[in-house]
């Protein structure tokens, strides 16, 4: 069974902030000591760290839940609780991280050591020392810690290779990779010998080097999931140059030109941008008897279907078995790579905008709905944040929360919707009566 895994869905939960403390200074010779409760510590973030030693997402096959520690509670003497350590999760180079709910790309991790916070820890709640005022010098008010961010993520590994080998099954991609690199892919005289991508490094006679990926053979309908389908088509996306391998011996009764058209159709159907990558046509198995005649026919059909002003793709006849033409092919590939820039994998519409947490006057602070039992239901990100950080065990904290609701315009909005004195209002699992 293959141990290669290139997709995974996981859940991450950052740590909650520690609760603030209500405490008072009681020391001999210090009359009217005042508040002395400290703030809670910050919750730990969940951080992805790129590790070049990893080659697969196999670590996420059985471990799909990642939870960072919460911050410690505030202490007496105004001391802060200790902040939690970040939970650092290693991922391989080439990992794309998406929000599973929205489908938006959060980050594309390609550099060794690159870090990205996928879930932010909650800030610590404030202790009562923070709420002292001339009017209320000894407040019994504290905040709960802010809940840590929680989300479901879709991970997708797209291997880092400069050059991708594509073609129908059994055209000789694995054989080619084995003779131009030190990679040892599985080679056999049957279809789909390669069932996972293989990666190898090429070094040309002139000393240039580049990474080559041998991808599992494509068949018609691959972009719709036929055969190995799109399972490995994603790995072509990071390549800058495509070597299109064609079996010129036509040993299985196939038409090399029809094969060429069919594979390009699958690449275009999967992702139109793949056709922006320059292609080199590699006609393999030229050591076979019928290959030269088939090559001439292939060139003729190719020329007939290209506009006179279009530049025909470069064609390199080779034999992976006898190594005929390999040096010329590799030099041409290196030269093409030198003048081919990186391709943008995602545009701005694919990426999730970076969120800055702060007050936004245009942000809708709360929403009002009505349940089937006639209870008014309050929701909204800003309102729920205040609710979760309120310590309902302290009367002063409850009154502070009521003032915050009035300040946000909740009372006026409820009246405008028709709420009457004594109506039930629910926030989360907490219910109270509306007082007009």
UniProtKB/Swiss-Prot annotation:
Q: Which keywords describe this protein according to UniProt?
A: Cytoplasm, GTP-binding, Hydrolase, Magnesium, Metal-binding, Nucleotide-binding
Residues that, per the record, bind Mg(2+): 174, 194
Cited HAMAP family: GTPase_Obg
EC number of this enzyme: 3.6.5.-
The name on file for this protein is GTPase Obg
Which positions fall inside the OCT domain?
358-436
Main localization category:
cytoplasm
Source organism per UniProt: Streptococcus pneumoniae serotype 2 (strain D39 / NCTC 7466)
Any transmembrane segments, and where?
Answer: none
Instruction: Tell me which residues bind GTP.
Output: 167-174, 192-196, 214-217, 284-287, 319-321
Q: Which PANTHER family match?
A: DEVELOPMENTALLY REGULATED GTP-BINDING PROTEIN-RELATED, MITOCHONDRIAL RIBOSOME-ASSOCIATED GTPASE 2
Query: Using the chain's own numbering, where are the disulfide bonds?
Result: none
Q: Which family does it belong to?
A: Belongs to the TRAFAC class OBG-HflX-like GTPase superfamily. OBG GTPase family.
Class of enzymatic activity (EC top level): hydrolase
Q: Which residues form the OBG-type G domain?
A: 161-338
Q: Which Gene3D superfamilies match?
A: GTP-binding protein OBG, C-terminal domain, GTP1/OBG domain, P-loop containing nucleotide triphosphate hydrolases
Instruction: List this protein's GO terms for biological process.
Output: ribosome biogenesis
